[in-house]
Amino acid sequence: TYRDQANALEKAIEKHFGYEIEGFHSYRYYEGNDILRSWICMPLVMGIYTRTQGTIDALFSPRLWTDDGLLTQAGTETFWDRSTLYALRGTIAAGEVEKGMNFLKKYSHRRLLGDHVPYAIEAWPEGDQRHLSAESGLYCRIYTEGLFGIRPTGLRSFEMTPRLPQEWEYMNLNRVRAFNSEFDIRVRRAGKKLHVEILKGGKPVLKKSVTEGATIKVNL
């Protein structure tokens, strides 16, 4: 089954890429690699959390993180928005919401409001800050797949693991067009839990209170 294949692939990734690199319990980029690379964020994006803490510590360490996001390789000056945006999404999805939001705010202020071009870029100095639509899409996916934790499971179904930042009381995602439907997602704090509602045409099709980090299955 696909699940069996996914489990086998996860074990293979851990066996080959799992590594202690520059003092961090994270991943190497290839066999023989001993320098941190920003692409260590990819397992987090794919829901592999075996080395979460070491990977997040490495990503936001001075070796990789700069005012402009992640260096593609420690010790260089080239930064890539693509790996930065993946890393922010993966960090939030892994449950490190406050750290992820802190760096997301810094990135957003710098890139969207700062003294650089006002959009997510490809890379610098490589690429000369090109505007690629993929990077803008990845910025949006921090919210849809990081904060709301949406993951498709079928043509009309998905899972979601909402991550509501501590300083927020609620978050909504309205008029989502996906899974052959148009629907709204509403998440609000309810004591120590999160109350989640899915609405179609203004009518609730799901109401559920869950603990932080719990996954909800949705069929539309």
Where are these regions (language model features)?
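Extended hydrophobic/Leu-rich segments
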Residues: 16-17, 52, 210, 218
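Active-site core of glycosidic bond-cleaving carbohydrate-active enzymes
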Residues: 4, 18-142, 146, 150-152
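Active-site neighborhood of glycoside hydrolase catalytic domains
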Residues: 1-17
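Non-catalytic C-terminal accessory modules of carbohydrate-active enzymes
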Residues: 93-220
